[in-house]
Amino acid sequence: MSTKFVEVGELKEGSYVVIDGEPCRVVEIEKSKTGKHGSAKARIVAVGMFDGGKRTLSLPVDAQIEVPIIEKFTAQILSISGDIIQLMDMRDYKTIEVPMKYVEDEAKGRLAPGSEVEVWQILDRYKIVRVK
């Protein structure tokens, strides 16, 4: 699991965070200053990258939050059998199996053996983002 920690105040919409062990994309962030002696708070709304679940989190802006390190690479589709897509990593030619549920909707109709796809590796899981 490759992650790093950043301050909540540095997050923006479109950033990625780890909430409850699930990598999520931030879709909304609200920062509010509380009273005279209180610290500012941030309310984060994020959507899970693998399960699509909506998660809400409220933290002080100076708190540390876990951010996944996303590794992007190109792979070639070797075969599609049922709900499993077998890929070959074009960097080191190792074989990877990705479930069909981890494929972006706009890429699903264009998958074919021999075509190249962009793959994101997030927290030791793989997601097919687009067909090249």
Curated annotation (Swiss-Prot):
The keyword Cytoplasm applies. It comes from Pyrobaculum arsenaticum (strain DSM 13514 / JCM 11321 / PZ6). Keywords: Cytoplasm, Hypusine, Initiation factor, Protein biosynthesis. SMART domains: eIF-5a. Functions by promoting the formation of the first peptide bond. GO terms for biological process: positive regulation of translational elongation; positive regulation of translational termination. SUPFAM superfamilies: Nucleic acid-binding proteins, Translation proteins SH3-like domain. The gene is eIF5A. It comes from the Archaea. This is Translation initiation factor 5A. Belongs to the eIF-5A family. PROSITE patterns: IF5A_HYPUSINE. HAMAP family: eIF_5A.
